[in-house]
Amino acid sequence: MEITIEMIWQKFREYDRLYFNNELPMPLVQLLKSYRLCGQFSCRKIIGRRRVKGQLLEISCYFDWEEDALRDVIVHEMIHYYLAYKHIDNYLTHGEEFQKMAEELNSKYGLNVTVKIDTSKFKRAPSAPKLGYYLSWIF
């Protein structure tokens, strides 16, 4: 399926309710035109206040997503967001806390959230440029 910003907003709200107890404020959402990154979460911290600002969730529109794979990528980025929001991991790493939370969600809800994903198995979205897709097979 090809994705839209509205679709990501809807899925964010659904996954926040299902997996994060509605604790995460809605971030800004953008579509990435990248075959190298499936998703990315970024934010900045307000020094001295322990607040997270400028939350940005980006999901690649380069791929023709299957429902489960898209869910796992969005939840992966939401784990980064949750850990930053709760000041558990302020560096947005795939460290011990990330892996522990991913394992808990995977076992409790039957997800497949991983640190890395093999995008060579994904189909290119019909609207995605072809050159980058073929370059992804070379590099």
Where are the regions a protein language model picked out?
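Active-site recognition of the HExxH zinc-binding catalytic motif
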Residues: 72-84
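Metalloprotease/metallohydrolase-associated module, dominated by Zn2+-dependent proteases
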Residues: 1-69, 85-139
